[in-house]
Regions:
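Extended, charge-biased low-complexity segments
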Residues: 1-70, 75, 85-114
Length: 114
């Protein structure tokens, strides 16, 4: 298992020149911490070679769908992060107007704006 701070640094290096949806997915996992710290997630979803570390989104989807033991909210965060990483909702091709509309809808979804 890789040290958390080292893994965060390596993942951020990987996403530095990556698509925004991948950076968003990785940052969500980093900020949440739960999955990045879990040895099972690291073994199943994080790949590395001599130069870099990355998240294999296909394996991360399989991991999430396999029934990993976690709270409902932890699973929801993982599911959202994987969906972002996979570009499931095609954010990478959204124009500015749709991007703003989607961001506003997501911001309102938890009911925090009341």
């Amino acid at each position: 298992m890789t040290d958390f701070d080292t893994l965060v640094r390596l993942l951020r290096r990987w996403t530095h020149n990556h698509d925004p949806h991948v950076r968003a997915a990785v940052e969500l996992l980093i900020e949440h911490e739960t999955w990045i710290r879990r040895a099972g997630f690291q073994r199943a979803c994080i790949e590395k070679n001599a130069r870099e570390v990355w998240i294999n989104w296909r394996k991360a989807r399989e991991f999430a769908d396999s029934g990993a033991v976690a709270s409902t909210s932890e699973m929801a965060v993982l599911d959202l992060a994987v969906a972002l990483g996979e570009d499931r909702y095609k954010f990478s091709i959204m124009g500015p107007a749709n991007s703003r509309m989607i961001a506003q809808a997501v911001a309102r979804a938890p009911g925090e704006d009341r």
